[in-house]
């Protein structure tokens, strides 16, 4: 078993790699900046290799702030794979748009770093730090193509609604802390186990569900998703629909299964209602779309409903099924957006026969 201090090696490798990409962006001549994509892929590969010693680990580090276990490892592999595929989708896209690759790839790595801390976080502080690292990176990436008005609008809308949802989530977490006296999820579960039902605790559950509901784009907290998905750069839309959703489900499982198992009847009922509304609304709205990215946005919303069913089950099999579904969804969704990127590269005349004039 590796030493205690080495458990953060993957995160340290990713952080150093992100800084290296920024340095290379300054040092490399403009004609050779295409190498930054390969450097970014190398960083992601090195981070993946750094995870290998911890396959069988099951420990808490940093005074109970972070857990190194198979649950976190599975999500980290999803994040790294989705980031790598996003980089591959972005190479030609950035050339066409004339955008700066160094900052772009740096932000992708920062978003991935935030997701990794979210997956391993077993403390409310760690979860919030990881969540905001990811969110701020996506706010910038959503509006990365500055001349594009829709991209700028998507970034502003995502930022404003994201800040509002964060406030709701923080309020719910502050109630959890106030009622338990700790921010560690497992200590919260222990503290709440002997307490009677408190209306403030029910309010905390509702607020946390609402805050995370925004992040996973569950109905009725989904209104930002279609506009942001449509306006953001296509590779970032792909990464946002996969990486951000997976990371949000990771903290959802951590908070409710580890932090508030005694409130199971309350949060299961809430997630059951959200799952039904999300599946129905997501699929019906997707049928009426004439823009492919908006259609995939509503498809992503519907998939959030399917994933919530595993949470509603609240059993080991339910969670396992949800994790398998999430892994398959990752590659399916990225493949769908890869088709959009491919179509965008082709001569538009080749697609004039399509019956949906605003397909892209």
Task: Put a short name on every predicted segment.
Residues 1-354:
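Alpha-helical transmembrane segments of multi-pass membrane proteins predominantly involved
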């Amino acid at each position: 078993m590796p030493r205690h201090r080495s458990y953060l090696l993957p995160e340290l490798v990713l952080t150093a790699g992100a800084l290296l990409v920024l340095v290379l962006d300054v040092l490399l001549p403009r004609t050779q900046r295409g190498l930054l994509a390969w450097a970014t892929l190398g960083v992601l590969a090195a981070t993946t290799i750094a995870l290998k010693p911890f396959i069988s680990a099951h420990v808490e580090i940093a005074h109970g702030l972070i857990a190194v276990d198979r649950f976190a490892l599975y999500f980290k592999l999803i994040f790294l794979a989705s980031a790598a595929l996003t980089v591959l989708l972005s190479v030609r896209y950035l050339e066409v748009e004339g955008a700066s690759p160094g900052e772009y790839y740096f932000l992708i790595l920062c978003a991935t770093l935030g997701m990794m801390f979210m997956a391993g976080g077993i403390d409310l502080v760690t979860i919030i730090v990881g969540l905001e690292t990811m969110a701020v990176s996506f706010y910038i990436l959503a509006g990365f193509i500055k001349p594009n008005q829709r991209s700028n609008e998507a970034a502003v809308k995502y930022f404003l609604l994201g800040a509002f949802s964060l406030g709701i989530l923080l309020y719910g977490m502050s109630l959890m802390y106030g009622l338990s006296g700790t921010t560690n999820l497992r200590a919260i579960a222990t503290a709440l186990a002997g307490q009677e039902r408190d209306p403030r605790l029910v309010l905390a559950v509702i607020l946390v569900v609402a805050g995370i509901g925004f992040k996973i784009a569950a109905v009725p907290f989904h209104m930002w998703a279609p506009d942001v998905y449509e306006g953001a750069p296509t590779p970032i839309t792909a990464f946002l629909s996969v990486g951000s959703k997976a990371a949000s489900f990771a903290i959802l499982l951590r908070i409710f299964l580890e932090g508030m198992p005694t409130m199971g009847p309350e949060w299961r009922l809430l997630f059951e209602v959200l799952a039904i509304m999300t599946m129905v609304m997501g699929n019906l709205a997707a049928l009426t779309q004439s823009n492919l990215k908006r259609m995939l946005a509503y498809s992503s919303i519907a998939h959030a409903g399917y994933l919530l069913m595993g949470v509603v089950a609240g059993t080991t099999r339910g969670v396992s099924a949800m994790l398998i579904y999430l892994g398959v969804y990752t590659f399916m969704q990225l493949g769908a957006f890869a088709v959009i990127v491919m179509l965008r590269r082709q001569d538009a005349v080749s697609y004039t026969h399509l019956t949906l004039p605003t397909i892209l």
